[in-house]
């Protein structure tokens, strides 16, 4: 059974990483990014709920006299 020659693997792996890095750099360089991003304030509409318009009194069990 012949021996597997792995002497060129390091060169192939390093060249692959280099090519991938260059490809990603070229892809990223073509993107248009905003120069001055600003936060947009989103306003949620206030919804009136029935319990907000009525006055209710809540009695806690611990606050009752003994």
Curated annotation (Swiss-Prot):
Show the Pfam families listed in the entry: ATP-synt_8
Keywords from the UniProt entry: Acetylation, ATP synthesis, CF(0), Hydrogen ion transport, Ion transport, Membrane, Mitochondrion, Transmembrane, Transmembrane helix, Transport
Which GO cellular component terms are attached?
mitochondrial membrane; proton-transporting ATP synthase complex
Instruction: Name the residues that span the membrane.
Output: 8-24
Report membrane topology.
Answer: Single-pass membrane protein
Q: Which GO terms describe its biological process?
A: proton motive force-driven ATP synthesis
Q: Which residues carry this modification: N6-acetyllysine?
A: 54, 57
Q: Which residues carry this modification: N6-succinyllysine?
A: 54
User: What are this entry's molecular-function GO terms?
Assistant: proton transmembrane transporter activity
Q: Which family does it belong to?
A: Belongs to the ATPase protein 8 family.
Its subunit composition reads: Component of the ATP synthase complex composed at least of ATP5F1A/subunit alpha, ATP5F1B/subunit beta, ATP5MC1/subunit c (homooctomer), MT-ATP6/subunit a, MT-ATP8/subunit 8, ATP5ME/subunit e, ATP5MF/subunit f, ATP5MG/subunit g, ATP5MK/subunit k, ATP5MJ/subunit j, ATP5F1C/subunit gamma, ATP5F1D/subunit delta, ATP5F1E/subunit epsilon, ATP5PF/subunit F6, ATP5PB/subunit b, ATP5PD/subunit d, ATP5PO/subunit OSCP.
Name under which the protein is recorded: ATP synthase F(0) complex subunit 8
Q: Which gene encodes it?
A: MT-ATP8
């Amino acid at each position: 059974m012949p021996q597997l020659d792995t002497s060129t693997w390091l060169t192939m792996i390093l060249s692959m990483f280099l090519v991938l890095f260059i490809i990603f750099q070229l892809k990223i360089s073509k993107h248009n990014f905003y120069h001055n991003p600003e936060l947009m304030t989103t306003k949620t509409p206030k919804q009136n709920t029935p319990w907000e318009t009525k006055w209710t009194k809540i009695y806690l069990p611990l606050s009752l006299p003994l």
